[in-house]
Amino acid sequence: MAPKFPDCVEELRAAGNESFRNGQYAEASALYGRALRVLQAQGSSDPEEESVLYSNRAACHLKDGNCRDCIKDCTSALALVPFSIKPLLRRASAYEALEKYPMAYVDYKTVLQIDDSVTSALEGINRMTRALMDSLGPEWRLKLPSIPLVPVSAQKRWNSLPSENHKEMAKSKSKETTATKNRVPSAGDVEKAKVLKEEGNELVKKGNHKKAIEKYSESLLCSNLESATYSNRALCYLVLKQYTEAVKDCTEALKLDGKNVKAFYRRAQAHKALKDYKSSFADISNLLQIEPRNGPAQKLRQEVKQNLH
């Protein structure tokens, strides 16, 4: 005998959640579908509730490998509540499984506009960038569908959601980040990284620092073991007055090469711009231990010294 389903939307959704947690995805999908029909029959205009039900059913389809229905349900969820993170991530995963990499890239990128700390989206962007470079070549960005601009209201809505939503998105963050950093690049990846770094260097010579940052970033996606790529990108951030980013990149560069003089110098410049004179002075001192006669560093030390007193 078929199980008797509850008739109220909240109970149906709760039962669906329970079935999903128990790995009964087909049953969960049926419960979410019934909840949707009940909600629509009531003529209730509750787009958020309806959107969540579509998104939950999409998660069931994804678990069962039914990517096309997952995409369909996510699209319905997003039509009701645009720029919702969960349906965007689920649709991106489904597109990726179907090897529709440009579409997956757009959805992952949209998530990062809403919250740039969502690890699964960062991981997804990295995978899609490599796949698109392989399949479409160096001009792959020109062949992408347009990426929607996320309104500030959508970002505010996400930030005002209960912290559980944020915790769920951040789950296993440190583990995944470590896995990415520890990934050993192949010989092909290293070669590709080198070519992209050189393209970045050429753009710097032409004064196009924004484009150069993109090239260095693509290079680091292929191989994040090159200290010079980080310190070169740091230079671009300095020119664009993005001092915090410059400090981060110099720190990464120095982790890979503790005697990278340019990284010490650029981090000292960034610290000085951020009025962190103590850290700036420490970086110059470390630099001068490696290169005691470095003229620009000696000059910068004098400038920083004046601000220390």
Curated annotation (Swiss-Prot):
Xref: Gene3D superfamilies: Tetratricopeptide repeat domain
Biased composition (Basic and acidic residues): 164-178
GO cellular component: cytosol; mitochondrial outer membrane
Annotated region described as Disordered, given as residue ranges: 161-189
A Pfam family per the record: TPR_1
TPR repeat placement: 9-42, 51-84, 86-118, 193-226, 227-260, 262-294
Cellular location(s): Cytoplasm; Mitochondrion outer membrane
Single GO biological process annotation from the record: protein targeting to mitochondrion
Covalent cross-link site, Glycyl lysine isopeptide (Lys-Gly) (interchain with G-Cter in SUMO2): 197
Subunit note: Interacts with HSP90A, VCP, ATP6V1D, KIAA0665, AMPK, and DMAP1 through its TPR repeat.
Similarity annotation: Belongs to the Tom34 family.
Biological function: Plays a role in the import of cytosolically synthesized preproteins into mitochondria. Binds the mature portion of precursor proteins. Interacts with cellular components, and possesses weak ATPase activity. May be a chaperone-like protein that helps to keep newly synthesized precursors in an unfolded import compatible state.
Name this protein carries in UniProt: Mitochondrial import receptor subunit TOM34
Organism whose genome encodes this protein: Pongo abelii (Sumatran orangutan)
Gene behind this protein: TOMM34
